[in-house]
Every structure is written in C-alpha cells, then in structure tokens.
Amino acid sequence: MGDMTNSDFYSKNQRNESSHGGEFGCSMEELRSLMELRGTEAVVKIKETYGDTESICRRLKTSPVEGLPGTAPDLEKRKQIFGQNFIPPKKPKTFLQLVWEALQDVTLIILEIAAIISLGLSFYHPPGESNEGCATAQGGAEDEGEAEAGWIEGAAILLSVICVVLVTAFNDWSKEKQFRGLQSRIEQEQKFTVVRAGQVVQIPVAEIVVGDIAQIKYGDLLPADGLFIQGNDLKIDESSLTGESDQVRKSVDKDPMLLSGTHVMEGSGRMVVTAVGVNSQTGIIFTLLGAGGEEEEKKDKKGVKKGDGLQLPAADGAAPANAAGSANASLVNGKMQDGSADSSQSKAKQQDGAAAMEMQPLKSAEGGDADDKKKANMHKKEKSVLQGKLTKLAVQIGKAGLVMSAITVIILVLYFTVDTFVVNKKPWLTECTPVYVQYFVKFFIIGVTVLVVAVPEGLPLAVTISLAYSVKKMMKDNNLVRHLDACETMGNATAICSDKTGTLTTNRMTVVQAYVGDVHYKEIPDPSSINAKTLELLVNAIAINSAYTTKILPPEKEGALPRQVGNKTECGLLGFVLDLRQDYEPVRSQMPEEKLYKVYTFNSVRKSMSTVIKMPDESFRMYSKGASEIVLKKCCKILSGAGEPRVFRPRDRDEMVKKVIEPMACDGLRTICVAYRDFPSSPEPDWDNENDILNELTCICVVGIEDPVRPEVPEAIRKCQRAGITVRMVTGDNINTARAIAIKCGIIHPGEDFLCLEGKEFNRRIRNEKGEIEQERIDKIWPKLRVLARSSPTDKHTLVKGIIDSTHTEQRQVVAVTGDGTNDGPALKKADVGFAMGIAGTDVAKEASDIILTDDNFSSIVKAVMWGRNVYDSISKFLQFQLTVNVVAVIVAFTGACITQDSPLKAVQMLWVNLIMDTFASLALATEPPTETLLLRKPYGRNKPLISRTMMKNILGHAVYQLTLIFTLLFVGEKMFQIDSGRNAPLHSPPSEHYTIIFNTFVMMQLFNEINARKIHGERNVFDGIFRNPIFCTIVLGTFAIQIVIVQFGGKPFSCSPLQLDQWMWCIFIGLGELVWGQVIATIPTSRLKFLKEAGRLTQKEEIPEEELNEDVEEIDHAERELRRGQILWFRGLNRIQTQIRVVKAFRSSLYEGLEKPESRTSIHNFMAHPEFRIEDSQPHIPLIDDTDLEEDAALKQNSSPPSSLNKNNSAIDSGINLTTDTSKSATSSSPGSPIHSLETSL
C-alpha cells in the first residue's frame, strides 16, 4: 500500500498508461465512466482495466492508509485536472430581471394599459371635439391647462406603477442577497472527514479532491463518488439515485461503488474519491436537469410561465410568500405570477425543481435528487398554518375587491349612458366617440383603483419581510432556519418532543461509576485495585471495539477539558481507560483497523457493537459492548475479583440489576456492559449466524456514564411551560435514567399526575389486538405522557403523529421535535417544526429538519418560540392595519363613484395610499423586535383564526370612525371649510381643495391608526416600546413628510390643491382623533360583541384539496421536466419518477394501515433502524415490522382505498407527511447541505 509510485506496477500496466497524457494514471473521463457502472459489472471493469482498487489508488498517487500528502500544489493540480467538488450555483437574478418580474403583476398590467389608453386619448384631438353635443357631456369648455390634465393623470399612474415595481424589485433583490449569504454560511458549515498525510482531518465538502481517502460512517451523506477500499458492514441507501429502496451492502469484491448523494445507513469504512462536483453521479444528473440553467430560463419565459404555474405548489406548500401567491396576481384571476411574489421564491421554484439546481458545493448535490427534494419540501407539512389562513383570507378579500370594482365600473358606465343618452337625449355622434371613450377609460381607471386598494398585495410582502427579518435575527440566537415558514409555525407550538442526549444534556460523556471484579465502585477505581488480567481485557475491549475514528485529544486551551472526537459514548469509555492510567493507542496500533477480522456494527436490532479479532494462536476473540440490560442477558459468565470467569446465572443477573444497574440509573447514569467471548480456531464459527455468535459472553464490567444536564435547560423548560408549551422527553435510555434526568430538567415535578413509559409499554397501550395503532388509544396517553424511554425512532414518529392528528383537545396541537440521529428523520419530517442539532446531528437529520440549532442547545428553541410568536403578531398587526384601510378605501371609492360619478380618492392617490399601507406599513409593523412578554401567553394553536374578535372590533371600530368623517367631509366639507365643492366635477377639471382635504385626512387617519395597529391584544399603551423600533418611527415620519410634499406640490399629477395651515391642522386633528378613538374601542369589552365574527380560520377539511392538487400537479411537473431532458438518464429518471409517484400514493393511505408482509424494506425503515452507536439510542426498537416497513407496499395495494378513519380530516397532512416519511429516503437524500434549497423554496 505504502509506495504510491510503484515502479513494477507501472511497467506492468504500461499499455494502460500510454493513453493518458496527464500526470495521473487515469483520466477524469475514465473515472467518470467507471463510476457509472454498478455491482459485478464494475468489479469486472476494475479487474480488467486497473487490477484492483489499490492500483487505482496508486494511479491517483494516493495511499489508502496515509491519504494524500495534502500539499497546496498537489491539491491545486487535482482540482485543475479532475475538477472541484462544487456545482456552480445558478447566477442570481439581476435587478432588471426582478423589475421585469414585478411588472408581471396582473393589477399593475391593467393599470398600465388604462394609463396608456388615457395618455393616448389625451393627445388625440378629433375634429368634432368642439361639437356642442360632446361639450355638454364633457361638462363645459376646458381651458388650456385643464386639457393637459388628461395626460398628466396617465403619466402619474405610470410613474406610481414604476415606483411600486422598483420597491418590489428592491425588496426581492435584498432578500435574495440575504439568502445567498445564508447559503454560503450553510455551505461553510458542512465538513467531511478525510485522511491527509496520515492525519484524520475534517475539511469543508467543497475542498474534497479526487484521490482523497474519505472516512465514512453511519449517518453520512456521501459528498463525492468513490471506491470502497476497506470497512465494516457498510450498507448504503441508494434510493436517491436509483429509486430502489433496499439498502445495498458494499464490499471490495462485490460492489465497491459509492455514489455521491447516497446515505450511509450502517457501518463505517474508507473510500478513495474518484469523481467530484459536476463529474460525480449526482453532479451529472444536476447538469442534465439544469441543462446549464439557461434553457430552463428561456423555457420559463415562454407562454404563461407554465413552469411557474405548475411549480408554485412545489415551491413548498409552506412558503409564506407564495401563500398569498403574488397576492394580486394570484388573487385576481388565480393565475400565479412571479410578479410580486418573492423573486427568491420563483428563483427557488426554478432551481429547486428538477430544473437548474442551485447547487451548493456538492453537498447540495449530495442531495441526490432535486425532484425528490422538491417533493419533500412540497409535502413537508400541511401548508404552514399561517400561510393557509393567509391564502384563504387573501382570496376572499380579492374576490370581494373584484366584485366591488366590477360593480363600480358597471354603475358608472350605466349612470353616464343613461344620463347622457336617455335623460339628456344626446345622440351618439361619431366625432364624440373619443370623448366618450375617455369617460369610459376614466371609469375603468376608477374601477381598477378600487381593485388595487382592495387586493392586499402587501400580505405576502409583510409575511416575507417579517420572516426574512426574523430569520436574520434568529441566526444570532443560534437558530439556522432552513424552511422559512417553520419560524412562524414555531410561534404556535403547543408541544416539544425533545431528545435527551446533547439537547437537554451536554453530550460530554464521562464514566463516573463502575462494577468490576465483583465490586461496585462509586467513583473511578484505582487501577491497582483491579486484577491485572481483568484490566488488560477491559482496555483491549474498549480500545478495539470502538470506532477507530473516536479519540480523546488533548485540550485546545490550557486548563480546558480534553476534546472528545467521534461517538460520545465511546469517548466516555476511552476516557475511562485514560482515567485508569492506561493508554488505548498502543493497543490500536498493534491491532490496526485493517486487521479486524469481523465487525458487527451497532444497529437498532443488535443494540450492541462487537468486534472479532484473530489471536496469535489462530483462535478468535470477540469483544462486545452495549446497553447493560441487553448485553447482560447474553452473558453466561462474569469475571471475578481474581480475574477468573465464574458462572453468571439469571438470578445473579436479577440481583445485579437490582443492586448495581438500577441505582446507577436512578442517579441519571447510562449503563454500558463490556464483555468478551473466545472461539476456537477450528472449526471456524459461522460468523453470519449472529444469534449463536453474540451469545454465551463473559461480562468484564458494567460502567455508569454521566451526561450532565445543561445548566440553562431547567430555566428554558420553565419558560416553555409558562408559555403553555408542554415539553416531553423522548430518549433511548432506560426509564430510571430518563426519569432522573427529567426531574433534574424540570420536565416532571414529583407529585404531579404524569406518565413515564418505556417504548414497549407505550406500544402495548396504543395498539389493538391486531397490532394496529388506534388514535383513540393514543389520545388516552399523550396528554399525560412526559417521558418516553427506551423508545425507537418508530415510537418517536408514532407519538409525534399521534399528537398532531389528535382532535382530542379543542385546540389542535402543533408539535416541534428535536433530533440528531439518522433515525430521527421521520419524526423530524412529520413534526410541524423539526429541529436538528448543528453539532451532534447527522447530515440526514439536518436535511429532514426545518431549523438547525447551531449550538445544540434547548434554550435556543425557546428563542425560536419567541420569534415565531413575534412573526405571527407582526402579521396580525399588519392585517389589522391593512384591512381597516381596505374597507374604508373601497367603500369610499365605491360609494363616492356611485353617488358623485367620481371617486373622491383618485387613481394616483390610491396608488400612494396603497404604497404606504402595503409596502411601508408592512416594513414598519413586520420588524417589531420580540419581547419576553410574548412568552407569557398561551400558544394560538392550529385552528385559531388569523383575525381575532378583538382585532375585528378594532378594524370595524376604526373603519366606522374613518368612514363617518370622510363622508361628512365629502357631503358637507365644502360648507365647513367654505370652499368650492369638488363633487360632479367635469372630466378634466383642476384639482379641488375639497377633495384634497378628504385625501389628506384619509392619509392622516391611516398614519395615526398605524400606531394603534402596533397592539392587537387590546393593550392600552400603544406607544409602549415604539422607540425600540427605529424602522417604525422612520417610516411614520417619512410618510408624513412625503404627504406634505404631495399635497403642497403634487398639483395635477396627484390631483391635489395646496392647503392652508388651518386646513392642515384640521386634517391632523382628525387624524389624532384615531388615537383617542382607539382608547374608546379598547374600553368596549370584546365579549359583549357577540355578533363579531372571526376571520381567517382554517378548518381541517380545507387543508386537503390544496395539498392533493399539489401532488398531482407536482407529478405532472416532474414528468414533464424529466422527460424533456437529455436521454442519457432516461431510465434512471423514469425509475425515480415512478418511485416518487408510487411513494406519494403509498403514503397517501394512512401511515399505520395494512400490515401485510413487506415485500421490500423501504429505506425509511432502515433509516429508522440504525442509530449511531450511541447508547441513548440503544433502543429496544420493536422489530420494525410494524408500520413503516409496510407502508410502501401495503399502500400500493390499496392506494385506491380511502385513508383510515382517524385521518379523515387530515389526509392532507398525511399525504404530505407520510410522503415525507418516505422521503426521508428521498428528501433526506436530497441535498442535505442545501438547506437553502428548502429555504428559498419556502420563501
């Protein structure tokens, strides 16, 4: 292995070498084509062309043991010849493209057309213009100045449209910039372990080069293609590339091909990297799918943006912004536009789809499948709670606005026609046609104006701004948000199911008690008190039977604790060896990893890890370790104080459990048993017969490992409980350990009525005689359940699903889950919000999550709750403000137009009002910082309407005040101010003071009402904390300043006539009245106003159709996109699509239905079945025959059958998430590293 440039080798293989001009023994193309082969085909090819994997290492000038030398010139050369492990992201949209997108907005287009017609007509002077018949219709002769007004109005509308477009585009641009920043942050955080110059180092995924020796372990997502060179029991889930859900066992002689984007489900090993970036299998797929991204762009621009329309659902049902779609567009005619929807969302739509993938350094390629990913995002959850409510509300408002504007136009046209041609009996003269048309255009503009004000296009903007602002700030609080909507959902959380290890505890394991040689030591024993033979066995057992990647390194700083690298439980055991003043390194160098004869890696069926070595006398010895209650059952002997094995009977075991294990557990310790067994050299045992091998062990010792509770956790849990959130602990530890820790954390308090169950008991209680899970049974348990111990990932998933699906309480539950192991994927996906651990979490867990806790700390979850509630409140504040403006403006424009034949608020003024109430108000109200007081109230829950009765009271109360004053001004204002009336003015008359006062008063009332809108729970002090929000103050003052300019100098474009000081004072005084009136409204008890209805409530049934529709559209979209791409991956693509469609259908039927014999193990099943060797996970995983196994197949057989009754109201959720249960294979497989995918998609 050692000599990399082996001369014999070269001479022998000269013929193969001659064709390579490069410095390496094989070219990029050869390696690339080699990696496209599978199984035996690949083995044959390697043998024929290269000899074996070692020769490939030599050609690549690398050593399987030492790795690359790691010198800068060498790495650089490799990058040049073989490429970098990076798939270039798609170029961000330019500002102009964003402007173009913003222009796609339907209402804006209508306004532009109307303005252009109006402009055109104002320049067209027909010969009959002086005709008297027309003149009457025009309301008398015009002077020169008035004739100009026609074009001024048209130009002003165009100008304001440009303003709106620029503001929208700027918002999108800054948002996109922010997310790219977030993306690069996520990229940097992803590292992989490689061997360089004999040292094991972690390097960013983008730095991996061809020839690197990468160490792979359970839970990894492979960042590049490579050849397996050595390892134990390695099983890979390749479903992300092949669509096959079975795990593939890898071995040097049968199938050494390891592909990027696939998951390590079990075992560990080393591989030599053979292809990176665009040349890896995933990279090739992305390149094909993206077709360089360019074609996609062109295609998307054609026609009705077919892609966009279809992809909208794909952009994550949960995307707040695309919630109200691009509100105006989507609302006006249901046609989804990119318009004012976030560009980053539309960008994500194109990229995230099977389109030009926005690929981060390979990690996102690791994603395997873009489409799987997209699918996963889309079905991630039922629509984000808030978003579902917003969409519904926005659609309702949009429809109402459309009806109102249509009626306005019809009434105006009828009134004009009847008045002109019937009452005044005017004939229709051809020369008058342009004049009449001008009238109709004016009416049309008024109609569109009503619509513009009615449609709340600020909603998606408010949501986006609020979320983007929160996400940015949450990064400082150690919450890396991957799906934007998760941030808002978190505010509604009613339950948190948390892991113990690493989240509630520090995940720094130390052995504090031990039972060795018949003595129970309450602290680390002195090595001299342990028999030398026993001590040697103990050191060998721990050193050899632990992953060789697990190490204890010297502390980084003077006086700090030693660094623990690798599996924390094993670190604790190695620390124990060091505490016994022994050294594990010499043992490992004597018995290197390559010499290990057989390794039974930890998995959830074995719940232990065992390693077989060959002794000098050719016999075999197996070392074993695992959860004490599991391993002790397999022991028939135990080492005595003299170091001799003596018989260990079941009754001895029971006594040991009582006297040693239970007391340790009650101290909150995890107990691990270390054992061994000797085998004769002949006959050689049948190593595949595990039941015989992993039996008749001899116990060496039992140790108690402490994992202390994080100091800040009890306070954080107290805050959650005060905020009405129930915290449950789900752990693999035994019940006594779990209960002890739960009491320390404050999850349970002695004397309370609560349940602590073990996984087995939990399953017994929730299943009927047939072994099926029943929702009613779960409903009896979950309200009191606080600790679920010895639980398998399936149990965790079952619990989360049970709580989410429960209709047992009035408020449906919103559940957050934390997880770090690969097997937590399903539960993380099922939960409303999944938190993955940034430090201890596996790639798979991170990929399945919505938020990554960068410090693995539970108290960061409390911050997320605070931010989430703040988002919800910000949006409610904005709604309260916006709806008041909407109601008033629409009624004023409608009534005014119908009674006076002209809207008191002109088109350009309305656009200005629209700008302040939408864009500026959303900025002002959506950026309120959160306060601790948010944690003093109960969560809203899933069914709470968006607009509470208090808010409805505020909206109607303020609308009544505003309408009363505006109509008073409209009909008697001219008498009050002794000015000319502005009613019934002729077509191009100059702006009147009368209407200017109405406009100014209207804006002043909105400004002061914006201050009222800061409080939505009926608080009296609306100024509380106003100076903590500089953005709010700036916007209110800025709007006021611009209003002065518009009124005093706006002139004809804004239809404004300058006002005198006393008129200004009246306008401001009426505006200030809003604040006083606000106090009056606050005094009225909401409970008395029974007639008030809430709005924006989401009933469970409404969650369904949208989602199912999404699925269908999504499938069509997939297929279309896939089939249009190059033929090379035709079959693979097809295969993948079929799998996905199958999966969607399969999981649409209830998760726990149909328990037929599985025909294949779905990957999620395996997924759940293999925790890392962390004993907290050494769960008695009930052999997972129950649910997940069968879902795919069982459901396939019954995909026509309706979902089980317990899910009737929830099939949306089910289809969404059960899909995700399986997408743990696809979604998780799909770009782990690219949370940003998901992030953008969900924007």
Curated annotation (Swiss-Prot):
Protein name per the record: Plasma membrane calcium-transporting ATPase 2
GO biological process: auditory receptor cell stereocilium organization; calcium ion transport; cell morphogenesis; cerebellar granule cell differentiation; cerebellar Purkinje cell differentiation; cerebellar Purkinje cell layer morphogenesis; cerebellum development; cGMP metabolic process
SMART domains: Cation_ATPase_N
Residue ranges, Cytoplasmic side: 1-94, 174-390, 462-875, 927-946, 1010-1028, 1083-1243
Catalytic residues (positions): D499 (4-aspartylphosphate intermediate)
Pfam families assigned: ATP_Ca_trans_C, Cation_ATPase, Cation_ATPase_C, Cation_ATPase_N, E1-E2_ATPase, Hydrolase
Reactions performed catalytically: Ca(2+)(in) + ATP + H2O = Ca(2+)(out) + ADP + phosphate + H(+)
Taxonomic path: Eukaryota, Metazoa, Chordata, Craniata, Vertebrata
Similarity-based family: Belongs to the cation transport ATPase (P-type) (TC 3.A.3) family. Type IIB subfamily.
Record-listed Mg(2+) binding positions: D820, D824
Assembly notes: Interacts with PDZD11.
Modified residues (Phosphoserine): S18, S27, S1178, S1201, S1211
UniProt-annotated stretches for the region Calmodulin-binding subdomain B: 1141-1150
Source organism of the structure: Rattus norvegicus (Rat)
GO molecular function, one term: ATP hydrolysis activity
